[in-house]
Curated annotation (Swiss-Prot):
Organism: Microtus lusitanicus (Lusitanian pine vole)
Protein name: Cytochrome b
One Gene Ontology molecular-function label: ubiquinol-cytochrome-c reductase activity
Residues reported in the UniProt entry to bind heme b b566: 97, 196
Subunit record text: The cytochrome bc1 complex contains 11 subunits: 3 respiratory subunits (MT-CYB, CYC1 and UQCRFS1), 2 core proteins (UQCRC1 and UQCRC2) and 6 low-molecular weight proteins (UQCRH/QCR6, UQCRB/QCR7, UQCRQ/QCR8, UQCR10/QCR9, UQCR11/QCR10 and a cleavage product of UQCRFS1). This cytochrome bc1 complex then forms a dimer.
Cofactor detail note: Binds 2 heme b groups non-covalently.
GO CC list: mitochondrial inner membrane; respiratory chain complex III
Subcellular location: Mitochondrion inner membrane
Reported cofactor(s): heme b
Keyword Electron transport belongs to the record: yes
Positions that bind a ubiquinone: 201
Length: 380
């Protein structure tokens, strides 16, 4: 009798994706983040669904409904904080996943990589709209500042902003549509994730050496299901410690004050995972220039296959580019710190220097380092 998982039209797809999938025998824990992101997405959709049952997307009651969830709904406080901190865990996994892709040259799988960049934009858009929903001070002013950036687009900017707002300011219409988009986008993201996996399984996974691993494959189950399970346990432990012991550590105290259009907070800043991009935006005095730099700071990932000059795929055996890579990581941490600081000396100049360094490393220094390493190889 043939095994059902190999013959059933639906189970067969799952089998080829998660059970009998040929995987390289040497992939490290850096390859765990794909499954962890899937877990984060599932947690966010599930907790979000329960929050949506009690939330009201009206400016008069939104803040109160979130308070009601935390105080009156059974385990509402847990669901709310799981959802808020789940977003942070999602972005930690995302950044590590992208960082792994850059380090090991996974961007050479162009379709998979570009789908990943689209996913990153979609997740960032979803998180931004979600942050607006509690209708606290930072929700309101964050929405006002970020949507206002679109007014920098020549000719159609102002019309576009008013169209997104549904009026002449961020108000009831804006909140309602943001809730609608925030609800539907995770399901679109789930569909895009399936396309991301489809493209990945066309080529097979990369590995730490960057070499072809067709001659040395092992089945995904049980080897990598067990390995992923360890990652899941570590993530869930960190997640529950964060949620149960330090639920507000990554949030902004200003968001516990109801939105007030007449009172601007002293420092308007987004959630921690957007601070690096926010720092790049603020480092350019020109509005349109800042918006373009902001978009390019993420879109530059899509250019990485074009900027690859090395004969080797991964950075495993490339010490010069490795140095550039870790300087880039440090630079992103500096940008994250600067994004949360006020716009004054010396933070302005540090932010501008870090922004220039960010683009210079990716667009100039890493490609040059790749060419130098090629020449060193040719000398042998």
């Amino acid at each position: 009798m043939t095994i059902i998982r190999k013959k059933h039209p639906l189970i067969k797809i799952i089998n080829h994706s998660f059970i009998d999938l040929p995987a390289p025998s040497n992939i490290s824990s850096w390859w765990n983040f794909g499954s962890l992101l899937g877990l984060c997405l599932a947690i966010q959709i599930l907790t979000g669904l329960f929050l949506a049952m009690h939330y009201t997307s009206d400016t008069a009651t939104a803040f109160s409904s979130v308070t009601h969830i935390c105080r009156d709904v059974n385990y509402g406080w847990l669901i709310r904080y799981m959802h808020a901190n789940g977003a942070s865990m999602f972005f930690i996994c995302l950044f590590l996943h992208v960082g792994r892709g850059v380090y090991y040259g996974s961007y050479n799988m162009i379709e998979t990589w570009n789908m990943g960049v689209i996913l990153l934009f979609a997740v960032m858009a979803t998180a931004f709209m979600g942050y607006v929903l509690p209708w606290g001070q930072m929700s309101f002013w964050g929405a006002t500042v970020i949507t206002n950036l679109l007014s920098a687009i020549p000719y159609i900017g102002t019309t576009l902003v008013e169209w997104i707002w549904g009026g002449f300011s961020v108000d009831k219409a804006t909140l309602t549509r943001f809730f609608a988009f925030h609800f539907i986008l995770p399901f679109i993201i789930t569909a895009l994730v399936l396309v991301h996996l489809l493209f990945l399984h066309e080529t097979g996974s990369n590995n730490p050496t960057g070499l072809n691993s067709d001659a040395d494959k092992i089945p995904f189950h049980p080897y990598y299901t067990i390995k992923d399970l360890l990652g899941v346990l570590v993530l869930l432990m960190a997640f529950m410690i964060l949620t149960l012991f330090f639920p507000d550590i990554l949030g902004d105290p200003d968001n516990y004050t109801p939105a007030n259009p007449l009172n601007t907070p002293p420092h308007i800043k987004p959630e921690w995972y957007f601070l690096f991009a926010y720092a790049i935006l603020r480092s350019i005095p020109n509005k349109l220039g800042g918006v373009l730099a902001l978009i390019l700071s993420i879109l530059i990932l899509a250019l990485m296959p074009l900027l690859h000059t090395s004969k080797q795929r991964a950075l495993t055996f490339r010490p010069i580019t490795q140095t550039m890579y870790w300087i880039l990581v440090a630079d992103l941490l500096v940008l994250t710190w600067i994004g949360g600081q006020p716009v004054e000396y010396p933070f302005i100049i540090i932010g501008q220097t870090a922004s220039i360094t960010y683009f210079a490393i990716i667009m100039i220094l890493m490609p040059i380092a790749g060419m130098i390493e090629n020449n060193i190889l040719d000398l042998d």
